[in-house]
């Protein structure tokens, strides 16, 4: 009896120690997150004004805004999503619906996993060699292509996973009434997996909206307003990078404000994506 009691006490002490270590580790992580968000709010909110969204990036020593950088980020992100999403959805559909157990799917999944974990600067260098050097100049379209390449693996993985979660009974029911396979995929599988696929697209947007490295090698930057996709275009991440390293207080303040804008945008997209996932699980 005493042996059982002592064993219980020993396990209880070990459990308490491990729980304490887990709480401390979680607290350290949350503390760093709180410090980062606190610094962004403290320094970023000080520069928030209407001029940030209505004026162009200023020359050194002058006041201004981030209008052209915000516009450039939106344009390249939209193009990247438009290009990357269909490719990712179709590839994920093939892997889940047509070639689930094929060797080609295994190879594609392996390559996709590599792309998911590859540093974005490698994608930037690849597009630089593929487009920028042959064209002879930086361009917004090259930046959009780099972002599209970053979008594809995220959407592929999400689409495949969501379609694999669709019960086979639904597919069999569609096939039983004589529907072709592509109709079953479109009307049954896609409908059941829609919220999960949309979640993956939103997470892809959240990822590329803060990417700096691939745009440094492709779209570079532009201090002026530009709607020409065949010319360098400003973007918020690159502008933040440039302004944060400058010795000018006005530029540094705009860098903090731009960082706050990106952080809040990514946070909002992530929360919305999680809410979609939660609704799907409730159903």
Curated annotation (Swiss-Prot):
<feature type="transmembrane region" description="Helical">
    <location>
        <begin position="136"/>
        <end position="156"/>
    </location>
</feature>
<keyword id="KW-0592">Phosphate transport</keyword>
<dbReference type="InterPro" id="IPR035906">
    <property type="entry name" value="MetI-like_sf"/>
</dbReference>
<feature type="domain" description="ABC transmembrane type-1">
    <location>
        <begin position="70"/>
        <end position="273"/>
    </location>
</feature>
<feature type="transmembrane region" description="Helical">
    <location>
        <begin position="110"/>
        <end position="130"/>
    </location>
</feature>
<feature type="transmembrane region" description="Helical">
    <location>
        <begin position="70"/>
        <end position="90"/>
    </location>
</feature>
<dbReference type="GO" id="GO:0005886">
    <property type="term" value="C:plasma membrane"/>
</dbReference>
<comment type="similarity">
    <text>Belongs to the binding-protein-dependent transport system permease family. CysTW subfamily.</text>
</comment>
<keyword id="KW-1003">Cell membrane</keyword>
<dbReference type="InterPro" id="IPR051408">
    <property type="entry name" value="Phosphate_transprt_permease"/>
</dbReference>
<dbReference type="GO" id="GO:0035435">
    <property type="term" value="P:phosphate ion transmembrane transport"/>
</dbReference>
<keyword id="KW-0472">Membrane</keyword>
<feature type="transmembrane region" description="Helical">
    <location>
        <begin position="253"/>
        <end position="273"/>
    </location>
</feature>
<dbReference type="InterPro" id="IPR005672">
    <property type="entry name" value="Phosphate_PstA"/>
</dbReference>
<dbReference type="InterPro" id="IPR000515">
    <property type="entry name" value="MetI-like"/>
</dbReference>
<keyword id="KW-0997">Cell inner membrane</keyword>
<keyword id="KW-0813">Transport</keyword>
<dbReference type="Pfam" id="PF00528">
    <property type="entry name" value="BPD_transp_1"/>
</dbReference>
<protein>
    <recommendedName>
        <fullName>Phosphate transport system permease protein PstA</fullName>
    </recommendedName>
</protein>
<keyword id="KW-1133">Transmembrane helix</keyword>
<keyword id="KW-0812">Transmembrane</keyword>
<dbReference type="GO" id="GO:0005315">
    <property type="term" value="F:phosphate transmembrane transporter activity"/>
</dbReference>
<feature type="transmembrane region" description="Helical">
    <location>
        <begin position="20"/>
        <end position="42"/>
    </location>
</feature>
<feature type="transmembrane region" description="Helical">
    <location>
        <begin position="197"/>
        <end position="217"/>
    </location>
</feature>
<comment type="function">
    <text>Part of a binding-protein-dependent transport system for phosphate; probably responsible for the translocation of the substrate across the membrane.</text>
</comment>
